[in-house]
Amino acid sequence: MKILVSACLLGRNCKYNGGNNHSAAVIDFLQGHEVIPVCPEVLAGLGTPRTPVEIVQGEVKTKDGKSVDKALRQAVAQILEENPDADCAVLKSRSPTCGVKQVYDGTFSGKLVDGMGVLAQALKDAGYRVIDVEDLP
């Protein structure tokens, strides 16, 4: 199987704070599969570390109000275009790009709401199986 994976889950330091979300469960799940690391924020040129972003009324913005929506959506489109034969995606929970079940509410207060990040939603809309990392066995 060819699996798209949030790069931070593989130990890449691409989180907004310069860290990662390395997950032994993800590494175990991926054994024997072709792995494609993805980080829309880095692909969009947002850098690491970077100002946090959240979805604010449908638009991805930085904490200081700058829209990065166009760049992120272009990065998402590129990921889909370059990986038409991926079988599924394992994505980081609560991320504004990768969140599968919940994302932060856009107030930068730490409050969660039901919803999907822009990459997760685009993958789902394109018919990919999208898995929240927290749902792995």
Region roles according to the model:
Residues 1-4:
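Extreme N-terminal starter segment of soluble prokaryotic enzymes
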Residues 6-7, 39, 90-94:
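Short beta-strand segments
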Residues 11-18:
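Short N-terminal binding/cap micro-motifs at the start of the first secondary-structure element
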Residues 37-40, 89, 131-133:
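General beta-strand structural signal in soluble alpha/beta enzymes
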Residues 43, 52-55, 60-83, 111-137:
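Divalent-metal-activated hydrolytic enzyme cores
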Residues 78-107:
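N-terminal glycine-rich phosphate/adenylate-binding segment common to multiple enzyme folds
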